[in-house]
Amino acid sequence: MGAKTGLLVYADGDIPELLRRAGAADRDRTATMMRRLYPGRGIEECEGSVLSDGVYPPEGTVYAASWPGVEVVGDRGMMIDLPTQLPEHLVAASAGRRLVLHNMHSVVDWLAFAVWEDGRLVRSLSLSPDDGVMENIGEPFPFELPYWAGDRSADVIPWPDEDEEPYPLPFHPLELGEDALRALCGFVQEGRPEDDDVNADHIRLHGFRIRDPHGSGPAKKEAALQGTGEAVGPPRFYTFGPDGLLVENDGV
């Protein structure tokens, strides 16, 4: 699967320590949190996951858990290029506590993370080799400093028979992404686990399917695509005629 995250965490204190102490999350408590964070959406319970896998659920599914002091939400819908565009009601829900957003996608080497304290943004970073630095707000955290200082330059292996080109960024976003995930949430996706890391394989998340009453769920999207194909009709084939103009054929 690669390193992919769409993760939102609310906490009253140190997230890694709170997750280390987390037991089984109450389903009713978690469902109440879901209704608060997804107002006006249809919410149906489904099979859950563990934290290590639940940070990147299938489309239309959210994996979540709520404990006293800490709440976790895994949702692809949180994967936004600019963390400052996180919906206001999600930021408002962090009043009096810390909010961490962590997004990562290994296919495009993209990383975005942000931290709010009591609803106030203190740090936001989003970057990828294709788009460069899209957002960089606030003072870097200590775990970032070696990267910005040039001590963690990207080590990219070129394809065979291709010349090596300089990596567009001073470091690899996914390497910083793993360090950010560990520092902010206590675990990693693909890095080497450390002794005091949170065991994300042992933390269960409840599953929920999210439906927009005014939008399109997976079934509606499939039907819409089928309808588009029917509207387009069968393929039409053309060849060049003797006069050099396109002439429609019955097929090939």
Locations of regions flagged by a protein language model:
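Generic detector of well-ordered alpha-helical segments enriched in charged/polar residues
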Residues: 16-20, 31, 35, 87-91, ...
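Short, extreme N-terminal segment that most often corresponds to the first beta-strand
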Residues: 1-33, 247-252
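Long, compositionally biased intrinsically disordered terminal regions
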Residues: 103-104, 110, 118-252
